[in-house]
Amino acid sequence: MNSLFASTARGLEELLKTELEKLGAVECQVVQGGVHFQGDTRLIYQSLMWSRLASRIILPMGECKVYSDLDLYLGVQAINWTEIFNPGATFAVHFSGLNDTIRNSQYGAMKVKDAIVDAFTRKNLPRPNVDRESPDLRINVWLNKETASIALDLSGDGLHLRGYRDRAGLAPIKETLAAAIVMRSGWQPGTPLLDPMCGSGTLLIEAAMWATDRAPGLHRGHWGFSGWAQHDETIWQEVKAEAQTRARKGLAEYSSHFYGSDSDARVIERARSNARRAGIGELITFEVKDVAQLSNPLPKGPYGTVISNPPYGERLDSEPALIALHSLLGRIMKNQFGGWNLSLFSASPDLLGSLQLRADKQFKAKNGPLDCVQKNYHIAETTADSKPATVAEDYANRLRKNLKKLEKWARQEGIECYRLYDADLPEYNVAVDRYGDWAVIQEYAPPKTVDAQKARQRLFDIIAATLSVLGIPPNKLVLKTRERQKGKNQYQKMSEKGEFLEVSEYNARLWVNLTDYLDTGLFLDHRIARRMLGEMSQGKDFLNLFSYTGSASVHAGLGGARSTTTVDMSRTYLEWAERNLRLNGLSGRAHRLIQADCLGWLREANEQFDLIFIDPPTFSNSKRMEASFDVQRDHVALMKDLKRLLRKGGTIMFSNNKRGFRMDLEGLAELGLTAQEITQKTLSPDFARNRQIHNCWLICAA
């Protein structure tokens, strides 16, 4: 009997133990990452040929203590390598692990190689050659603290390489993991199996090979025992012949069918090729179609199983599409696959929540470095009085109600950008803005007391409901997370897409960027204030301070201003403002753009203006500004500087976003200024619920 070890992906150890026992292994012991077992030579070949779950089959050769590189050398050389190697066999060493002595795996591999080669030369035998690419023997050494474990890898290449997959095509899951997913799915061979996001077909091919009793090792051309002196070719050929006989019989007797689809025609062609190479191509029908086109291939029965490894995203901007995909799959399953089972393997349990289905079972496993979960569902048979579940129903109803009211109002006003929802319901704490046929969801960061998992799942529900209510494709929904802004955070870049969208606001055309910054380039709550500025601008010299992207300057210019002066500290936003002005035919000397610290420029300027708009930050201590600024503390001093630039009879429109702002009317009176609050006049219906979003004043000389 031989002591052996079968490695596997984390989470599959018990499944592998059961498989090995069915093959005849004894004394099976599960450890993290694999199973120790005992077996004769025939079992070695049986496990290599038939294990669908093992990554490698390892034959331990010995252990040694390593306190120095000499200890490693002598420990390896103590093994009788001349009785392990066939004459002329090539080899490679795979070394993993470090300690205080062996600090580099390449150095460790070199010492092992030297010890093996010297074992031959000391006996005056021809030294074996190293072949790193395709060796006859692969020696594995694991160093754990002071103990080195030396073993012969009888697999050669990893056992997940069945020989049917085009190596040029990347697979998101290895074949061994795919086999485990199929085994855990609850699918019964002989019943239909469908993968609506099949990619290169790995799940379906592994299922078909299992169902037709086709050994996973049948198509492999190279093994790790070809240079092993104890290899028994007779037994190996018997094992191989038995596998071939069983495969022919299994294929001839199998009567059910497999169905795969994917939106990418190239991967479907690859899947067909893989299935043909695996010898089960005739059992699988592959089609090019996306999930939206998914339908039950057997509406009259029998019931089957839908299985898939759907895509998941690591980037925030990919989530809307993925949530929509999972939500859509859930609806299709409930509408068309009543009585079927569903099994999905994913690195994102939150995305699986978007299915709006309750799992009967779940399993955990590792896919490389990723922690993954497999969830199994049974789809109840639908009845005539069955009502489809609504995702985030309260939120969806409120959004639908707001849309009905605001869409008509926006059309009448001639605006394309407006707020549809602003945390109307406390449990759905987001803002939803419409930009033409796009939507932006801004998630207000939940407090630390809220469970992060629940908050994320609720956000996914919000996205799914928003897409459903607005009827927009996922690629036209942008997701952002908004926290309380400090200083210049709101101006920091979030992305590098550089995609601009042209929108209309009354008679103005403006550029917005929905992805690259937290804000889009257009403050929607100031819409009416901008229109008022346009109405007040005829024949006047207009100054726009803290101008952002210059949308107020556009309205003033279109309103007939004699000149516009646009001042901001950011070159990026001034260039944006220039684009906005140019889009509306406003260019030339009459429309100046000045990059400067607005407060510093204000103190130095000696020009005169009839109409001034200023919307300063609530607080700023930018390194590029000469001093910190607090709008509550400093607004009177600000008005003093502004008055110096104001022509007789001129007007200042002053706005800020500080909640609870108190205008110092006495301080203004001492400057000879009067202030009229116009906040309510500047709030449009889409911001009617949030009356503190800004405050706005008209200030004139007394």
From Swiss-Prot:
Keyword list, A-Z: Cytoplasm, Methyltransferase, RNA-binding, rRNA processing, S-adenosyl-L-methionine, Transferase
Subcellular location, record wording: Cytoplasm
Keyword Oxidoreductase among record annotations: no
Presence of keyword Cytoplasm: yes
Residue stretches spanning the membrane: none
Gene3D superfamilies in alphabetical order: 3.30.2130.30, RNA methyltransferase domain (HRMD) like (3.30.750.80), Vaccinia Virus protein VP39 (3.40.50.150)
Top-rank taxon: Bacteria
Domain THUMP: 43-154
Single GO MF descriptor: 23S rRNA (guanine(2445)-N(2))-methyltransferase activity
InterPro entries attached to this UniProt entry: 23SrRNA_methyltr_KL, DNA_methylase_N6_adenine_CS, RlmKL-like_Mtase, RlmKL-like_Mtase_CS, RlmL_1st, SAM-dep_methyl-trfase, SAM-dependent_MTases_sf, THUMP_dom
Name used for this protein in its record: Ribosomal RNA large subunit methyltransferase K/L
Family listed: Belongs to the methyltransferase superfamily. RlmKL family.
Task of the protein: Specifically methylates the guanine in position 2445 (m2G2445) and the guanine in position 2069 (m7G2069) of 23S rRNA.
Pfam families: Methyltrans_SAM, RlmL_1st, THUMP, UPF0020
PROSITE patterns from the UniProt entry: THUMP, UPF0020
Species of origin: Salmonella arizonae (strain ATCC BAA-731 / CDC346-86 / RSK2980)
Gene Ontology cellular component terms for the protein in this record: cytoplasm
Entry-linked NCBIfam families: PRK11783.1 (NF008748)
Entry EC no(s): 2.1.1.173, 2.1.1.264
Reaction catalysis annotation: guanosine(2445) in 23S rRNA + S-adenosyl-L-methionine = N(2)-methylguanosine(2445) in 23S rRNA + S-adenosyl-L-homocysteine + H(+); guanosine(2069) in 23S rRNA + S-adenosyl-L-methionine = N(2)-methylguanosine(2069) in 23S rRNA + S-adenosyl-L-homocysteine + H(+)
